[in-house]
Amino acid sequence: MKKNNLLYVLFGLAILGYGIFTYQFISNQIINYNAYNSKETKITINKPNNINEDGSFVLSNSTITKDFEKKDGVRTYNWYADPYCPDCIRIHEATHEYIEQSLKDGSIQIMFHPLNFTSHKSGEYSLTISAWVSGLADVSQDSEKVYKFMTKIWNNATKEDLKNLTDVSLEEKIVNIANEIGFSKKEVKQVSDNLKGYEFAINQASVNIRRMDKFKELSPKKDKSFFVPFIYGENGKALDGESEKIDSDILGPLKGLVPCSESCH
């Protein structure tokens, strides 16, 4: 009987120990989650300065904002891109001179949506770099600098240089690029300190975007799927980001020279 009592006691202690362990584990997860989203960690996902909660932001001739500024005669576009995506790089390289000039003269505003859309191929590359793009847009009011950083990032030579680096080496390279473009040490440190928050925003956006019905209406593809680069204006369907006819299918609509209905199909 004493032997059975001892077994019951040991069994009870085991259950109690497991219960305490489980409680502490769950409590720690809650604490860690709250800390991850608290002001103490300086993660800006809950209260971004210049960007939206999905990491998107608008570049114009004057500043960086969360939404388009209503101005007559200004063309507005949404631009979804992944820094690892070959077509995203190709389109950016072909259009960046026009976009840069149009941002300067105020004839165009673009809401950029950095994504982690190719994570199955790129590992942490797309996530890390997209987070840096959103982060720099969040801490800076200089739209010209941010677009120059994007042009350096959406570049084949840069991709080849960075894509196989470890996390630490990749961040060092990105920091060097940001410094060369002219971001202050304070701005760069702010992004580095808050990078997990920006990564969280990018990941959430990249997952949620696949569930949004609006892209089925905008997509020029037969299967109505979302793809990158996904670029669309206030009216019409998205441009054909996979097209080899850059002048007619991409630059033409961006310049307002070719109606989207003629090139986006």
Residues of each region from the PLM?
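Loop/turn elements at helix/coil->beta-strand transitions in domains of secreted/extracellular proteins
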Residues: 73-76, 105-110, 139-148, 181-187, ...
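Structural alpha/beta surface segment adjacent to cysteine/selenocysteine redox centers
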Residues: 89-174
